[in-house]
Amino acid sequence: MSAAVVATLPTLLLLLGLAAADCPSSSWVQFQSNCYIFLQTTVKIENIEDVRNQCTDSASGADMISIHNEEENAFILETFKKRWKAQDDILLGMFYDTDDESFKWYDKSNMTFNKWKNSEESQDLIDTCGFLQPKSGIWKKGNCEVSSVEGALCKAAVSYEKKYLPDHHILITALVIASTTILTITGAVVWFLYKRNLTSGLTNTAYTTAPQLPYNDDCILVDAEENEYVA
């Protein structure tokens, strides 16, 4: 039975590992199906791509922040209050597309939500970036040509396995696979022992000595002589 348990450990550890691997590392914070991190280092930049590189280099599939609803914006604001520290406005992962005159997210997700200040007036938006005010959660427009930023706010989607296979499903799957493997290996061991004992029994039977006659050669000779004398 111990061999069966050992045999299931790699599968069990792999599945439980998936359950623990919500985000790229413990430095990231998960909200719904995404992970977030604020890389709090002052970065001298020439353009927004330098900030974006901080995110794309931090984890596979990561990019600058995109925000799609009030709940996500509130989560970002709350996390800045409790965990992240920032005084300056934070660059959002958006750019102004002059072809269709609209803002777009760098991660190519749809622009379905905004939190612009009510006082924002239409203006020449070429080289305009979006900024998040970490204390209010309000967005504002500003020139992309900034010499430095306080940090990079990054976002990465939770892996497919975690997004579509929740923790309790992973645990149940792990237990089912482990139990099935243990039963299979145990059954194989029992069958092997049964076959070995059966083969051993047949071998012993084949080598059993033949039954001896009730008389040995000397007795037969004496009986023959007595019969001859009587005759």
Swiss-Prot record:
InterPro entries: C-type_lectin-like, C-type_lectin-like/link_sf, C-type_lectin/snaclec_domain, CTDL_fold. Glycans are attached at N110. Disulfide bonds join C129-C144. The chain crosses the membrane at residues 170-190. Residues 31-153 form the C-type lectin domain. It comes from the Eukaryota. GO terms for molecular function: carbohydrate binding. SMART domains: CLECT. Pfam families: Lectin_C. The keyword Cytoplasm applies. Residues 1-21 form the signal peptide. Keywords: Cell projection, Cytoplasm, Disulfide bond, Glycoprotein, Lectin, Membrane, Receptor, Signal, Transmembrane, Transmembrane helix. Residues 22-169 are extracellular. Residues 191-231 are cytoplasmic. GO terms for cellular component: cell cortex; filopodium; membrane; microvillus. It is found in: Membrane; Cell projection, Filopodium; Cytoplasm, Cell cortex; Cell projection, Microvillus. Its main location: membrane. It is a single-pass type I membrane protein. PROSITE patterns: C_TYPE_LECTIN_2 (PS50041). Potential multifunctional C-type lectin receptor that may play roles in endocytosis and phagocytosis as well as in cell adhesion and migration. This is CD302 antigen. The gene is CD302.
